[in-house]
Amino acid sequence: ENFNDPKNIFNTLMEYKKILLNENHKMNLIGKSTIDDFDQRHIIDCIQIIKHMPDKKKQVMDIGTGAGLPGVLLSILGYQNLHLVEKSPKKSAFLETCKAHLGLNYKIHTKPIAEISGVNIDYITARAFAPIEKIITATKKIIHKKTIYVLLKGKSYLSELNLINPQKYSWKNYPSITSEESKIIVLGIK
């Protein structure tokens, strides 16, 4: 399938949305209050990170994928070496359903992030998962000197960044296009 064709991408995104909303009542993948504003709150919010991840061939890991946000969306947008980490077997089964129905290509890890090793990840993404410091600690076994964290963060981002050692890490925060109090934190190892 041609993931560079905007019409194909759009149709696949809408098909994903349909699957997610259909399954949502069974396992609460997204908050009910966010359903009416799904495209803005979830799709646009997640895909705004791709400008910080220009190389779609690199190894990408989305931790705490849950409903597939942003992991499944990154796959729809053509990222080729994706690892989705979701310790809940129910949610992993949902990610498997999306993969099969939408013809996507990603590896699902149904275990806590700290238990994963043997991969060298270039980009790490997370949305509504854990404080930045916990994400860094949990991913120690899978990173290298050039790994970049691209994290979608809410209003607590500043207090989270205050706990990060500026001698070891450098970061920039970018405004979110979907929420004034949210940021995209792009963090690298010094």
Identify the residue ranges that each predicted region occupies.
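Conserved beta-strand signature within the Rossmann-like core of class I S-adenosyl-L-methionine
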Residues: 146-157
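Conserved beta-strand segments of alpha/beta enzyme cores
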Residues: 81, 105-107, 148, 167-170
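A short glycine-rich, Lys/Arg-flanked "PGG" loop and its adjoining helix->strand segment in the class I
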Residues: 136-148
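Alpha-helical transmembrane segments of helical membrane proteins, especially in multi-pass transport
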Residues: 126-133, 140
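Active-site capping/gating segments
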Residues: 83, 156-190
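Conserved SAM/SAH cofactor-binding pocket of Class I
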Residues: 47-122, 126
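Class I SAM-dependent transferase core
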Residues: 2-56, 61, 90-104
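Short alpha-helix immediately C-terminal to the canonical SAM-binding loop
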Residues: 91-93, 132, 157
